[in-house]
Regions:
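PAPS/PAP-binding and catalytic site of the sulfotransferase fold
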Residues: 180-186
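Short aromatic/basic micro-patch
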Residues: 105, 148, 178
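Glycine/proline-rich active-site loop of Rossmann-fold NAD(P)-dependent oxidoreductases
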Residues: 86, 112-125, 134, 139, ...
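Aromatic/hydrophobic pocket-lining residues that form π-stacking "cages" and hydrophobic walls in ligand
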Residues: 39, 92, 125-126, 185
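N-terminal Rossmann-like NAD(P)+-binding domain of SDR-like oxidoreductases, especially those catalyzing
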Residues: 1-111, 152
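Hydrophobic "lid"/C-terminal helical patch
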Residues: 130, 158-162, 185
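Conserved catalytic core of two-component sensor histidine kinases
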Residues: 155
Length: 186
């Protein structure tokens, strides 16, 4: 990394599947916590100063009907995936504040778009259900509120974050449209 001396690093790597995280907590913690920690500490030791864009999730705020979330909303959850992302976020903040790394952290809502064939995720599952002319199955009663963002819109926002030079460094990225899950299937 020192030879390349990158201007920007996008830390997008993570175990992102909530169900798989629940089944494999150790692997999730290794990937999501130690993956980020290894990246940040390598940059610190190499004494390079790239802009780091660190990806997170609105799952760090837990489950709430108080949407959309604000960046100063309390971080809390009991779920493996969420805890792994909370931990990585706190480590990112630590390396920014204590070691001076140039980190901008974003927390996105649920992402949807083309080429998402993970049918454990709600939008691909609903599309597959429509194609098969079967009703979608919700893991909940469909009464949860969620915010969604189209993948290309998220990419535009992430690119804008590379130009962030202000004091604020934590951003929630979403569409601003809150949807009842059951409404997605109508």
């Amino acid at each position: 990394m020192k030879e390349i001396n990158p201007d920007i690093i996008f830390n997008l790597a993570a175990e992102s599947q909530v169900l798989r995280s629940a089944d494999n907590p150790l692997d999730t913690y290794k990937s999501n916590i130690f993956g980020s920690l290894n990246l940040f500490d390598s940059i610190r030791k190499l004494q390079i100063n790239p802009k780091i864009i660190h990806a997170s999730t609105d799952k760090v705020y837990g489950i709430s009907d108080n949407l959309p979330y604000r960046e100063d909303h309390k971080l809390y959850s009991n779920f493996t995936y969420d805890i792994s992302k909370i931990s990585a976020d706190l480590i990112a903040q630590n390396y920014k504040e204590i070691y001076g790394l140039d980190i901008t952290l974003f927390r996105s809502c649920n992402i949807y778009g083309p080429a998402d064939f993970n049918y454990d995720r709600l939008i691909p599952h609903i599309v597959k259900s429509f194609i098969r002319k079967k009703p979608p199955i919700f893991r909940s009663n469909g009464k949860y509120l969620r915010e969604y963002i189209y993948v290309e819109d998220l990419i535009e926002y992430i690119i804008m974050l590379t130009r962030n030079r202000g004091e604020e460094y934590i951003f929630n990225l979403g569409s601003g449209v809150i949807t009842l899950l059951a409404d997605l299937s109508t």
